[in-house]
């Protein structure tokens, strides 16, 4: 059976409700913390390392919640939301691969910010390159990612780490 290789906003909302990968498995956050409108490509091959990739998008409009509070009179999307979106996508990749458990961001290596998302922007694109997936007692993905706004790269992150856990009692 061929896996679905693109996901709509409605698919992602189903994932946030726990309906895409099954109860107790990887979920995306619900709006307003869901930082992705669509996944245009997800693959177990390809990417910079040949081990998988995701491309996803967020449509920008001036009414998005964070522009009203970050910062008053100087609206900009918080960089941490772009970083969180990359973690969201790495976790989604694990669920899409059928690995059981709830996703948790476990850290990252170097993160660089060298641009910003303003209310005048049209589209943010996330590119995730899977470096490694560990399967076993701990299911973990390690990836590098980048964020572009209207075609210009503005953030990069190396060593994004996300695990899925069948129990988070001791986490």
Swiss-Prot record:
Biochemical pathway: Lipid metabolism; fatty acid biosynthesis
Stored InterPro entries: FabA, FabA_FabZ, HotDog_dom_sf
Keywords, sorted A to Z: Cytoplasm, Fatty acid biosynthesis, Fatty acid metabolism, Isomerase, Lipid biosynthesis, Lipid metabolism, Lyase
GO-annotated cellular components: cytoplasm
Gene Ontology annotations of biological process type: unsaturated fatty acid biosynthetic process
GO molecular-function terms, A-Z: (3R)-hydroxyacyl-[acyl-carrier-protein] dehydratase activity; trans-2-decenoyl-acyl-carrier-protein isomerase activity
Gene3D superfamilies given in the database record: Hotdog Thioesterase (3.10.129.10)
Subcellular location(s) of the protein: Cytoplasm
Catalytic activity field: a (3R)-hydroxyacyl-[ACP] = a (2E)-enoyl-[ACP] + H2O; (3R)-hydroxydecanoyl-[ACP] = (2E)-decenoyl-[ACP] + H2O; (2E)-decenoyl-[ACP] = (3Z)-decenoyl-[ACP]
Catalytic residues as annotated in Swiss-Prot or TrEMBL: 70
Transmembrane segments annotated in the record for this chain: none
The EC number(s) this enzyme carries: 4.2.1.59, 5.3.3.14
Major localisation: cytoplasm
Matching HAMAP family: FabA (MF_00405)
Protein function: Necessary for the introduction of cis unsaturation into fatty acids. Catalyzes the dehydration of (3R)-3-hydroxydecanoyl-ACP to E-(2)-decenoyl-ACP and then its isomerization to Z-(3)-decenoyl-ACP. Can catalyze the dehydratase reaction for beta-hydroxyacyl-ACPs with saturated chain lengths up to 16:0, being most active on intermediate chain length.
NCBIfam families: fabA, PRK05174.1
Family that this chain belongs to: Belongs to the thioester dehydratase family. FabA subfamily.
Quaternary structure and partners: Homodimer.
This protein's name: 3-hydroxydecanoyl-[acyl-carrier-protein] dehydratase
């Amino acid at each position: 059976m061929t896996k679905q290789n693109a996901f709509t906003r409605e698919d992602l909302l189903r994932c946030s409700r726990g309906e895409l990968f099954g109860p107790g498995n990887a979920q995306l956050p619900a709006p307003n913390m869901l930082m992705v409108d669509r996944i245009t490509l997800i693959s177990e091959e390809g990417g910079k390392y040949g081990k998988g990739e995701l491309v996803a998008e967020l449509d920008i409009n001036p009414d998005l919640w964070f522009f009203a509070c970050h910062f008053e009179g100087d609206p900009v999307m918080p960089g941490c939301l772009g970083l969180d979106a990359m973690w969201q996508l790495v976790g989604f990749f694990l669920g899409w691969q059928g690995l059981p458990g709830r996703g948790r961001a476990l850290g990252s290596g170097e993160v660089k910010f060298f641009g910003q998302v303003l209310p005048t922007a049209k589209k943010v694109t996330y590119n995730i390159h899977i470096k490694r997936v560990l399967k076993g007692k701990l299911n973990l993905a390690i990836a590098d990612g980048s964020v572009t706004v209207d075609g210009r790269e503005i953030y990069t992150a190396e060593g994004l780490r996300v695990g899925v856990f069948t129990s988070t009692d001791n986490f």
